[in-house]
Regions:
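Tubulin/FtsZ superfamily GTPase core signature
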Residues: 1-145
Length: 145
């Protein structure tokens, strides 16, 4: 998804007003990034570890973003299971390796639509500065490649 409006629309389909306060706070953080960032990228991945971490790494590597980043991460898991602390640390490490100076706000929640062994990640990256994309050599201001 390229534009902020497309990202907002997608987030509207993922969050409902009936969700608990923890999730609502995370949605407000997504909105904060969308309102203040010069450019944004939304990444969604779903699956079991360690494949999920590899997918996240591949998605992040393809972005070629600048250095000043804010990241909002929502990790979801099936209500009948629980999230492993080691798995959560692995996912946050992938993000940190991608951008060591990144500001990360994260939260966890349940999603009954997931398989019991799967996680889903909803990650929004916002950059406060415009830059030249290393891949396409174009000036990027509204969206990331």
């Amino acid at each position: 998804m390229k534009t902020k409006e497309e990202i907002r629309h997608y987030l509207d389909t993922r969050f409902s007003p009936s969700e608990d306060d923890m999730v609502q706070i995370v949605r407000n953080d997504f909105d904060r990034i969308l309102n203040s960032a010069a450019s944004c990228a939304l990444i969604t991945v779903e699956g079991a570890m360690p494949v999920l971490a590899e997918q996240l790494h591949t998605e992040l590597e393809a972005l070629h973003t600048g250095a000043d980043l804010d990241v909002i991460v929502k990790v979801s898991y099936h209500p009948a299971s629980e999230i492993s602390f080691d798995d959560l640390c692995s996912l946050l490490t992938v993000i940190h390796e991608f951008a060591p100076q990144v500001n990360i706000v994260w939260g966890c929640g349940t999603d009954a639509k997931l398989a019991e062994t799967d996680y889903s990640i909803l990650l929004l990256i916002g950059t406060s500065t415009e830059y030249i994309c290393k891949t396409c050599q174009k000036h990027i201001g509204r969206s990331l490649c």
